[in-house]
């Protein structure tokens, strides 16, 4: 066993002494040592209950004959970090999470690991660490938050973000917004829609690194505690059978993950996270693969922000197994892919009797919400390296549009213009120098997109950025424009009043300026350089790759 590096042999007597100082007995040290990575904290609503999940995991490990040893991981709440300097640190935290777990699990060689994340960067960060370490592992997340219940109906965090714009527009009073604020997020869990956290938790289940039910079982249920106990027991089986993460994460898992991503209408952040995760297993997931799969995968779900359903509805409708079973009907699921159950995807679906229980929440493949997947990859003169849009959340009027560029070099400047009423129908807001390198940190633009929606401009205004978007964003929000402005990309050459053509069905994003004029602008171009006071962000800006390759650190 791997843990023998610190428990066995004459020369490891000092190590055993330190382990006994933890209160561990000889009998406990003779059993497999299982690291339990717990991202609990009292800051993030999706993580405040993770100690309960960890206790259940440890009970499962002990029941199966192991000795659990818990250690912490950080987690950022993107909602709390939104629209201020803190958002620059959210995406960098993904690599920091992966690196710190690698440090802990190598310095203290556990035989197996159970990972307990929940929110946006903690899930991909832990998946990256899992594949990097490649010891028998299982992930069990904290689960989704329930939707809020208000006098106006169901609500979630995005309802509140958009409420700010509605107040500004005069459609809602501040008193009504205050009521919404207190009711939209009723308790623990990852925010209730198909936002980034739930997208990644659902895809961890799809990939096979988490047990069935991981993506959709609500945080507040006893079923989530039972799932955590099963995860603790299952990791012991993985250890006994020597099934490792890289045995599970193969090209088959990549194909399944992208297909389910498109069927669910997941967050555009999956286009950053999945390539970074799969790269740890030596697999290359490109933008072209995303687009190829999107073109042939029907969009079966319209969960918030694209529609009125929430993750609890997806769970009641059959969850991820039901979505996979539906896609399996048209050959889009590789049933032979291995999972942490110790069985293949096909064996899991058969054992679960996976089927759709609500055809409004999970549409049949022959009557989908749309014939193509939730995410589209655009290319053109404005984004030669690619750009990303959640087409399932775009108003029909904005699928093909020629718009007038309104150019801003920061999110704050754009928000001021939107809230000040200076953005009109037919405008395309261009926010640049918000990419991985230029931000640095590639902030999410949820505040401006929510303001656009709240002010009733969602079917009339586009937002184009080298930054990224929250999974809660809806509308013609085109992000990850590559190359970014800080690297000399064409988005840095756009001027106020330029015309931009958006053609999502044709996968095109073009700046309608002739080549001679662009050449003149390029010759005079000097990228904006920001003063970066944070050592971490300075390192990040030097090391981060393009958004087109997952914003990975080199």
From Swiss-Prot:
Functions in the biosynthesis of branched-chain amino acids. Catalyzes the dehydration of (2R,3R)-2,3-dihydroxy-3-methylpentanoate (2,3-dihydroxy-3-methylvalerate) into 2-oxo-3-methylpentanoate (2-oxo-3-methylvalerate) and of (2R)-2,3-dihydroxy-3-methylbutanoate (2,3-dihydroxyisovalerate) into 2-oxo-3-methylbutanoate (2-oxoisovalerate), the penultimate precursor to L-isoleucine and L-valine, respectively. Keywords: 2Fe-2S, Amino-acid biosynthesis, Branched-chain amino acid biosynthesis, Iron, Iron-sulfur, Lyase, Magnesium, Metal-binding. GO terms for molecular function: 2 iron, 2 sulfur cluster binding; dihydroxy-acid dehydratase activity; magnesium ion binding. It catalyses: (2R)-2,3-dihydroxy-3-methylbutanoate = 3-methyl-2-oxobutanoate + H2O; (2R,3R)-2,3-dihydroxy-3-methylpentanoate = (S)-3-methyl-2-oxopentanoate + H2O. This is Dihydroxy-acid dehydratase. The modification N6-carboxylysine is found at residue 121. Belongs to the IlvD/Edd family. It comes from the Bacteria. Pathway: Amino-acid biosynthesis; L-isoleucine biosynthesis; L-isoleucine from 2-oxobutanoate: step 3/4; Amino-acid biosynthesis; L-valine biosynthesis; L-valine from pyruvate: step 3/4.
């Amino acid at each position: 066993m791997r843990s023998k590096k610190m428990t066995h042999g004459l020369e490891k007597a000092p190590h055993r002494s330190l382990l006994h100082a933890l209160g561990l007995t000889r009998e406990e040290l003779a059993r497999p040592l299982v690291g339990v990575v717990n991202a609990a904290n009292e800051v993030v609503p999706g993580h405040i209950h993770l100690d309960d999940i960890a206790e259940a995991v440890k009970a499962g490990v002990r029941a199966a004959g192991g000795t659990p040893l818990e250690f912490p991981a950080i987690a950022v709440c993107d909602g709390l970090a939104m629209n201020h300097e803190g958002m620059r640190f959210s995406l960098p935290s993904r690599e920091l999470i992966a690196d710190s777990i690698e440090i802990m699990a190598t310095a203290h060689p556990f035989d197996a690991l159970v990972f307990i994340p929940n929110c946006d960067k903690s899930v991909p960060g832990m998946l990256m660490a899992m594949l990097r370490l490649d010891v028998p592992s299982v992930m069990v997340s904290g689960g989704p938050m329930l939707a809020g219940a208000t006098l106006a109906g169901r609500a979630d965090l995005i309802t509140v973000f958009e409420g700010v714009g509605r107040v500004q527009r005069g459609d809602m009073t501040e008193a009504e917004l205050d009521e919404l604020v207190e009711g939209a997020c009723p308790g623990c869990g990852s925010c209730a829609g198909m936002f980034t956290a739930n997208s990644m938790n659902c895809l961890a289940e799809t990939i096979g690194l988490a047990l069935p039910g991981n993506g959709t079982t609500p945080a507040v249920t006893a079923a989530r505690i039972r799932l955590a106990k099963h995860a603790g027991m299952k990791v012991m089986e993985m250890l006994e059978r020597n099934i490792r993460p890289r045995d599970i994460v193969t090209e088959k898992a990549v194909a399944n993950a992208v297909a389910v991503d498109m069927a669910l209408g997941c967050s555009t952040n999956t286009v950053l996270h999945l390539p970074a995760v799969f790269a740890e297993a030596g697999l290359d997931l490109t933008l072209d693969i995303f687009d190829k799969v999107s073109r042939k995968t029907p969009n079966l779900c319209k969960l918030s922000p694209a529609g009125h359903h929430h993750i609890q509805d997806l769970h009641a409708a059959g969850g991820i197994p039901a979505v996979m079973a539906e896609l399996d009907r048209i050959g889009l699921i590789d049933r032979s892919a291995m999972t942490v159950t110790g069985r293949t995807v096909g064996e899991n679906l058969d054992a679960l009797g996976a089927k759709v229980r609500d055809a409004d929440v999970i549409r049949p493949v022959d009557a989908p919400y749309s014939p193509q997947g939730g995410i589209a990859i655009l290319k053109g003169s404005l984004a030669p390296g690619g750009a990303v849009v959640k087409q399932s959340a775009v108003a029909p009027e904005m699928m093909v549009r020629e718009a007038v560029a309104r150019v801003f070099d920061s999110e704050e400047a754009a928000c001021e213009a939107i809230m000040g009423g200076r953005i009109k129908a037919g405008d395309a807001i261009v926010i640049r120098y918000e990419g991985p390198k230029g931000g640095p940190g590639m902030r999410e633009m949820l505040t401006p997109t929510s303001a656009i929606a709240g002010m009733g401009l969602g079917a009339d205004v586009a937002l184009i950025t080298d930054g990224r978007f929250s999974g809660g964003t809806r509308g013609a929000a085109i992000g990850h424009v590559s190359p970014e402005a800080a690297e000399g990309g064409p988005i840095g050459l756009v001027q106020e009043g330029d015309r931009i053509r958006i053609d999502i069905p044709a996968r095109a994003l073009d700046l309608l300026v002739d080549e001679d004029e662009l050449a003149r602008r390029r010759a005079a171009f000097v990228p904006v350089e920001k003063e970066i006071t944070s050592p971490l962000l300075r390192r990040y800006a030097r090391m981060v790759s393009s958004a087109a390759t997952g914003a990975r650190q080199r």
